[in-house]
């Protein structure tokens, strides 16, 4: 190689090395990025831990009134319900350990059977059905409630996921059920950037009335809740902090997340029921109150 070519090569190498050194260092031929000279200082968004509420205490157990006679509880699993067996497991364990019977309404015995099944039970649990109830099923459910049967329904916000074919939206189908009970469920999720419990969608709720359902419930932790709109004939049971926002309504407010209309209770979340979540804060008190409501012991 001629001397002139050597000089040009050395010059090019020096320029490249200097450019790389501005933003990083070279170690054994590998570019290693340098850490930023300053840490982010924007509160809340870039440092969300500054907005976290103290984590809820994981303690307590579910105790219910043991004086009620044996009852049979039906859990709906026939309407493409979201993770129904996982979310109903704690309810099932508490009920059966107190001498009550739990049965599932399964897809294989769905057609034409709902009317018969509800006539055999004392209460019904419905967890996030993503398939609509038929007109016959809704009529049977209304008749069941009018005759003194009790229903607890857990709903959820709309969810969007992505698969090989694109976006898939899953929506809980409770609107046709709830029209008879002066309660409607939203489709958006609730969140709180200023007082959440770990993540922005993990929110705190507290009692909104002096009903037995809200007794000893001062700090419930909800994981993916939607809001409820309550008519004059229904009563709010739980509400969020006033700094809570909605992904659809886009405003801070104290949103209702549990409500009652006579023999029907609606809750805007079901994840708090699971084995890993029911011990957080006052969740076990809420679960116990809901079970006593099902058993007509409230």
Task: Describe each model-derived feature in a short phrase.
Residues 2-298:
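Short, surface-exposed patches at the edges or C-terminal ends of soluble domains, predominantly
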């Amino acid at each position: 190689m001629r001397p002139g070519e050597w000089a040009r090569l050395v010059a090019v190498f020096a320029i490249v090395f200097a450019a790389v050194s501005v933003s990083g260092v070279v170690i054994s031929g590998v570019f290693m990025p340098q850490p930023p000279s300053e840490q982010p200082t924007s509160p809340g968004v870039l440092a969300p831990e500054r907005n976290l509420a103290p984590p809820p205490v994981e303690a307590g157990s579910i105790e219910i009134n043991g004086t009620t006679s044996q009852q049979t509880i039906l859990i709906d699993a026939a309407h493409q319900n979201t993770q129904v067996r996982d979310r109903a497991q704690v309810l099932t364990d508490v009920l059966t350990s107190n001498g009550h019977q739990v049965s599932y309404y399964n897809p294989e015995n769905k057609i034409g059977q709902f009317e018969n099944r509800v006539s055999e039970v004392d209460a019904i649990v419905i967890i996030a059905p993503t398939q609509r109830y038929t007109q016959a099923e809704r009529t049977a459910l209304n008749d069941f409630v009018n005759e003194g049967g009790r229903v607890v329904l857990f709903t959820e916000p709309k969810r969007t996921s992505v698969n090989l074919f694109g976006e898939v939206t899953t929506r809980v189908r409770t609107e046709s059920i709830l029209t008879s009970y002066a309660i409607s469920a939203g489709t958006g999720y609730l969140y709180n950037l200023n007082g959440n419990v770990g993540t922005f969608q993990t929110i705190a709720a507290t009692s909104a009335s002096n009903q037995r359902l809200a007794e000893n419930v001062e700090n419930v932790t909800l994981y993916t809740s939607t809001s409820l709109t309550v008519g004059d004939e229904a009563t709010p049971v739980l509400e969020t902090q006033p700094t809570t926002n909605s992904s659809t309504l886009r405003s801070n407010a104290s949103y209702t997340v549990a409500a009652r209309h006579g023999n029907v209770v609606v809750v805007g979340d079901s994840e708090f029921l699971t084995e890993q979540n029911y011990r957080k804060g006052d969740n076990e008190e809420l679960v116990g109150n809901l079970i006593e409501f099902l058993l007509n012991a409230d």
